[in-house]
Curated annotation (Swiss-Prot):
GO MF terms held by the record: ATP binding; UDP-N-acetylmuramate-L-alanine ligase activity
Pathway in which the depicted protein is active: Cell wall biogenesis; peptidoglycan biosynthesis
Localization (cell): Cytoplasm
Annotated protein name in UniProt: UDP-N-acetylmuramate--L-alanine ligase
Residue sites binding ATP per the record: 129-135
Assigned keywords, A-Z: ATP-binding, Cell cycle, Cell division, Cell shape, Cell wall biogenesis/degradation, Cytoplasm, Ligase, Nucleotide-binding, Peptidoglycan synthesis
Amino acid sequence: MTIKHTQDLAQIRAMVPEMRRVKAIHFIGIGGAGMSGIAEVLLNEGYQISGSDLAANAVTDRLADKGATIFIGHEAHNVAHASVVVVSTAINEQNPEIQAAREKRIPIVRRAEMLAELMRFRHGIAVAGTHGKTTTTALVTQIYSEAGLDPTFVNGGLVKSAGTNARLGSSRILIAEADESDASFLHLQPMVTIVTNIEADHMDTYGGDFENLKQTFIDFLHNLPFYGQAILCIDDPVIRELIPRVSRQVITYGFSEDADVRIENYRQNGQQGQFTVVRKGKANLDITLNIPGRHNALNAAAAIAVATEDDIRDEAILRAMANTQGTGRRFDHLGEFETGNGVAMLVDDYGHHPTEVDVTIKAARNGWAEKRLVMIFQPHRYTRTRDLYDDFANVLEQVDVLLMLDVYAAGEKPIAGADGRSLCRTIRSRGKIDPIFVPDSQTLPSVLANILQDGDLVLTQGAGDVGKVARHLAALELNIGRMQQI
């Protein structure tokens, strides 16, 4: 599907009707990646933006620098001047700002509803799936940017090449990560949808029924217009099963022989992946991808499939793949450091589902086979740890050394037997490795100092505050002497 592009920002703003009676938009939980991205785009469109969160971070600081009003803490008076309030699913009904908005009859909308409003009059490209959404969104954005098409994008993580997770572009293209965690992606009505994979996650949203989750993805694909396109990973067994139920044009990608956009001859050399993309009726592309792992080759193939259908030049695709810097906390190479006992490499990764952890381990093994793999893992949510307990144990026992933090609760109450200590006990009983439970992340540097060896690859893994642990270790430069003093 070829679309007409324009570079005139004033023309685009004229094309996209404003929310006429809305002047001031308030975001509760503005520090989150998904919320901050929408806030930044709306701020650049000229709306008055305010928002609140429990703590300041780099995202809230950046928004404040751009002119947003940021409140630390949730108070009723924060919404006093708002025309509309945007909330994330992490915010409960007892929040004083929600209660104040209801009393004042200020409209309250979910994050996805506001994203849908941004997408309504644009050429929307939505990226959905259990894993790989953020990286795929970044790769699509990189291709369209390399082609000179200046897209608007809203991503769930930092696009390193842009230095932000969202930006208002001058064309009518909007590339957005679509979140299935609360089924709110059903508000979106894109022109093109990528689905990377479908696995059992966020099952509380779907009543514990995987069939319900699958049907929700089908419903989401049917939000496409009849002339829209579904770009689907045929390697995923659930997607392959669902394709006959999709009544829109389907373009498949993957390593599978019957994929419309097929990956061949994948090989990894350290941080880079190299492979050939075979496209029906088009020249093959010999890709050098500047991020590692077969899973990222799949993410790249999805982006290439979209770009190919939109007649983007092959040269732009090749440049985007070679130049991509990846996304924040996705196999994020933080450096190689002289430890005082040799040299060690530090990588940080956001993956928090067993499948994500597994592909990250494989990428580390394939690129640095000679290194001892030391993982610092933080489980995310008690419910996920409970529901995928055996899968976590199976994946985590693949590393050479495992330091286990306790569960990052994300607002959940503890569940007996679904915690870091229990997971350690289960893995230890299997006899492959002897994990070390570290109940206090503040003591982790000193624990790591006692086991670090020359040539180690230290991989911090998880969606909670383990990313802060990674940055702390990087600031200490993995120096054994400095870590022992913590």
